From Swiss-Prot:
PROSITE patterns, alphabetized: RIBOSOMAL_L34
Biological process per Gene Ontology, one example term: translation
Entry keyword annotation includes Cell inner membrane: no
Family recorded in the similarity comment: Belongs to the bacterial ribosomal protein bL34 family.
Alphabetical keyword list: Ribonucleoprotein, Ribosomal protein
The protein, known as: Large ribosomal subunit protein bL34
Molecular functions (GO terms): structural constituent of ribosome
The encoding gene: rpmH
HAMAP family: Ribosomal_bL34
GO CC terms of this entry: ribonucleoprotein complex; ribosome
Natural source organism: Rhodococcus erythropolis (strain PR4 / NBRC 100887)
Lineage top rank: taxon: Bacteria
Ribosomal protein is among the record's keywords: yes
């Protein structure tokens, strides 16, 4: 039985557009994510 293709095809532009800082800052929920990660002391806040 054949396996499907690998689903993770890395692409830096798509990564930034989907999970980036500017996108997170657009919504209230996104800002909450960033502030929670700041509070937790994460080295990396967003992708």
């Amino acid at each position: 039985m054949a396996k499907g293709k690998r689903t993770f095809q890395p692409n830096n532009r798509r990564r930034a557009r989907v999970h980036g800082f500017r996108l997170r800052m657009r919504t209230r929920a996104g800002r909450a994510i960033v502030s929670a990660r700041r509070r937790k002391g994460r080295d990396s806040l967003t992708a």
